Structure formats: C-alpha cells, structure tokens
Amino acid sequence: RDPMKELADECRKQGLKFGFYYSLGRDWEDPDVPTNWPTKAGRSNTWDFPDEDNKNLQAYIDRKVLPQLTELLTNYGEIAMMWFDTPEMVTKEQSRSIRRLIERLQPHCLINSRIGNGLGDYRIIEQKLMNEIDPKPWEACLTMGANWGYNKYDTVYKKPDMMIRNLTDVVSKGGN
C-alpha cells in the first residue's frame, strides 16, 4: 500500500493540486546530519551520532535527499509544490543541485524559499505578519496554536477572529 499515491490520486480526483513537505536539516535517524553546534544545538541526533566533526551534509544529500526527492517527483504524477524546511547548513551549490533536480523532473513545480540560499520561487514568512505590501510572492506560515504539529495536550489556540484577521492581513498585502 502506498498512502502518498492514494492521497495524490484523491487530490487530483477532487481537483486539488498536490505537493510535498521536505525537511532538509531535521533527519534524526541519519548519521550525517549536523547540528550546526553551537548555534542550533540539539537539532539532530547527537545521542546516536555524537561525532559532529565527521558529519557530512553532502554525503547525506547525495545518499538520501536526492534519491528521496527523485522518488517523490517521479512516482506521484504532477507535483505542484515542494515545501522545504530547515535548510540552515545547506550550501548554495547544494540548493542549486536540488533545484536542478526538481526543474528536470517537474518543470512546473513551485519551490519555496526554504530550499535555501535565495533559490526559491517565493518567500516564507514564519510566525509573523508583513508590515507592508510586498509585490514579490510570499507566504505566511502561522500556527493556529502553540505547536507546529498535532499535540493532543495543546490547549492554546488562536481565537477564530484572530485567525480571520491574520488571513485578511496576509491577503491584503499580497501574501498567501
């Protein structure tokens, strides 16, 4: 069973575009993902893979990221968007190689700015609102509560009128 294939097929059946989220720098099960110590300490798995000096982000990209992206971009039909996250230590050349792969396999796929190094098609603004209209494409990335993902113990949520105000503010300034 392939849940992503089922989801992609159902999205198309319902007239929705389909895309993927991909975290470039948060793979806790890979020995080559560095933490960017001391700036971003604790962002990778130093318990199982403590040798920060020998971690090799390029090896991780070549061995895991590019093959996974190839799978995502070739097995699920047309991909409308790749929504990347956490590119803190990705070099410009690494971002370029990822972008080239996407352009070759899915030439119409949108790529957000979190591919890193200014190579996205549009900018992500996280947990804040713009102060003025921005003519360049951008997206506000705002949570509805206190967490990025589901937490059954979460009890802090923005009130509906606040979420409507935020959405109105974003759209009025040209954002998504």
Describe the residue ranges of each PLM region:
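Mature catalytic domains of secreted/periplasmic carbohydrate-active enzymes
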Residues: 1-176
